């Protein structure tokens, strides 16, 4: 019955579109990338860009499927696999009547006369993000989105397997080449869609033109599994540049001043400078990113505006040290330290002789952030130039 209802619903949607003068070829769908990877430095707002698009186009939650790749991701966690499933079974007597708890059973009164239910374990096919999105796309004319976070942290060849062939789309937005579905997937899809559905015709899989796959990739991540060129060619790529953050209205559009300029967010680091003012987050980012670029000759390790979160436009001292400085020390300075640079020294307790800054120096004996040392480091950053390097 469910297969029939979904088929009827799809036909009704198609008829409505035709009455409106909208055909699949006219749809905005092909203007939206079918497969696109948003990439850039951490904190540039890659995931937010996707969310903005989905919100702006009123994509319903039932048409959005999410997953995150990691080193242990594989075909089973992305597509589906047989797994043990906990099920409930009623007990029946010889007459086919459910057996209930008796009054003299040593149970709370709430279960008195309730049917007895046994829990058993059975094996069944459990679909994951890809297959859930695939089924949904064949059940509706609406655009369906499969979102993959951190795609380069997993072994894409292992995760996609033979689905790799489906990523090659034709001019109509559908897979140029179909693949034979495994017996388990074929059985599952025939149960969900019906054996005559285009999504499993002749036991073959084919991506429809309303299924979009969008992914994010941090260029700073040290990928355990590099993405090969053949896989890359099947995606559109969108670079998200590091930029200042700007205010937006409820409609998602940028707010502008009287002169038509976008209004900056104006985040601050909740650490005082020598004049008693908080440090400007964007000014710090511009300077530290120029240092990182000098160290690494690359933008990959640089920080985006949304690398950490601000509360009431302030980045707390704890967040700044535990997230920003920890990242710099662990992922940048450790491998790309500047020899004899003034960036890593400070004068303690008014001493004339500078000493090296190590990460533990950012905390006092009680484990609280030492604001004065953090301020010294920020001052070093703001005053740094490549002439400091010998």
Descriptions of predicted regions:
Residues 1-390:
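C-terminal regulatory/interaction module of P-loop NTP-utilizing enzymes
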